[in-house]
Amino acid sequence: MNTTLPAPRGSQCAAVPRDRTAEDTVSTGWALAARAGDHEAADAFVRALHRDVVRYVAHLSADPQAAEDLAQDTFLRALRTLHRFEGRSSARTWLLTIARRAVVDDFRRAAARPLLADTDDWRATVERSQPTGLPGFEDGVALQELLATLPYDRRQAFVLTQLLGLSYAEAARAAGCPVGTVRSRVARARTALTAELERGEAETLARTA
């Protein structure tokens, strides 16, 4: 099993396969046009950023099955408050900030609901619904399962920078914390994920020895 995580991504766009700068310029333009009442621009804005929002909330909530509902909630919130968006940050950074709040609110609602059975525990749900064989991981190791082992703040920082390709500055704005805090959380997340991969490899070798 390959126990090496993807190389860290910093603030340089060259480290990200997609041209994030160009994409952000276009999507931000659509958001501003939508704010002015352009319905076609609003549709284009949603289509352009839907995938990033779904990926973000799926990893952050550790519940892939809830991702579409959380993404829909995010876009509804964004469209209701679009008149406040002035383009000082990219539309994607602004939208992911809203997505984070949607996930946090969902956690709070879930915590307020009484558990009806042991199967309501989110970890059990994660175990049943984990995707396997995700790109970048061999032998069926699921990234979602690994991320579920991380504390919320480290998982958030890792997803924003390493999976969605945000710079540390953009991730800090989305997470509402200093850049240095994001860097520290990403470093600790990578250390923890590497340890989990190595532990899994050791257990596999022990079973087959």
Where are these regions (language model features)?
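Residues within helix-turn-helix
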Residues: 65, 169, 180
